[in-house]
Amino acid sequence: AYCARRTLFDKDKDVKEINAETGREFIVDRSGWHLILLAKNKKGYQNLCKLVSQSWIDGFYDRPRIDKNILEKYHEGLIVCSACLGGEIPQKIMAKKIAEADEAIKWFKNLFGEDFYIEIQRHQTDKPASDTQVFERQQQIIPTLLSLAEKNNVKVIATNDVHFVEEEHAEAHDRLICLSTGRKLAEENRMHYTKQEWLKTPEEMFQIFKDIPQALENTQEIVDKV
């Protein structure tokens, strides 16, 4: 999902103030954050459908968006995960706003209880024409994510920011990014992914997160809920 920082109905301010940023993934205002929503039962699926509809009908501004007011209204039956570096909590940690990150965790924990999880990701890469800085930022925020998760009694899950299925699909994905952003493949100063965003096997994920085994174990808990 993409979750807007302000109410969706405050669109005049959006036009003046917002800069573009780059499961079903929603956006909660263009200046907002990524958020992962999963339906764990029929009610959750119905609410997910309502959120999708509202994001297109009432929340569309450059892209479909929801806000926390709508999320609060249709939260029943949903599992929520904090998302990648584009999520609210990682963004606030990277901005050194730790108290605000803690406040955001408390908000989600209060609404979703044990159905809220904090994600950690690692996309170390040596592939050509890839973003090598993502892994550095991920590593920098993981200690704080683990600390805040423990403080708020929220479980941590190890995830991969999946954008394609197989490892060999990375080059095709890179070309699709160029098409969607209107840039040439040879341009250096364009959007790059890490080329690690494929659907990794349990064995691959274990090798990446074997130092944080509980984060791997907790992913199975989500499977058992659905």
Label each PLM-derived region with a short phrase:
Residues A1-V226:
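Phosphodiester-processing cores and adjacent nucleic acid-binding clamps
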